[in-house]
Amino acid sequence: MISTSSFSCAGRKGANQDSFLIEQLNNERFLLAIADGMGGEDGGQIASHLAINSLKNDFISNPLLNLNTAFENVQKTFIEKVALEPQLKKMGTTLTACIINKDTVNLAHVGDTRIYHLRGNGIISRTKDQSELQQLLDEKIITKARAKNYPRKNILLSVMSAYREFKLQALSFEIMNGDRLLFLTDGAYSLISKRDIRDYSITNKQISGLVGKIRSHIESKEIRDDYTVVGCELNIS
């Protein structure tokens, strides 16, 4: 079983373009997902909701579906939506999802939402930002120090949309009793460091306490973008 805690709040724009999902598929399988929409006016909000609802409906119909197929179906849903409403052709969204089955996690990721994996005193990133900035860092064209002020840090190289091919990061890994996974949109992780998250995890015995502390930390900063955090902890009896 897992225990979960979450929040999702609008930034300065008013309408929250983030969406998330926590769904128990059967006694041992759980689906968690997070999306950060984009596309102007209502496009971003529609895109993230559309992606999350597509995942939910697919896995409710078939709990044993694989994430690769589910992500392909999300894009088909976008294509169908834009065919009916061409004004939404620029909408897109990040999408990051996990299937937790006992002690195994299957992950699929597109965009720059993140999953952090916490165990004891450690924290690692399970996703890699599919952004122009991350590519420049990988190619050592820009340093981490310069990256903080890079003006195009929000430019994504892969998103879920009707017209662009997406690049799927997929992986599987094992988790242990007490491990925690945190899903964060960029509006959240841009305002809190991995070190602070790790420290809060060490001092909060419940996942709800950790997520609450992260929210308090974020809301003490100057908020610009929508911010969403989904946390879960594996509890093996």
Q: What residue ranges belong to the model's regions?
A:
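PP2C/PPM-type serine/threonine phosphatase catalytic domain
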Residues: 1-237
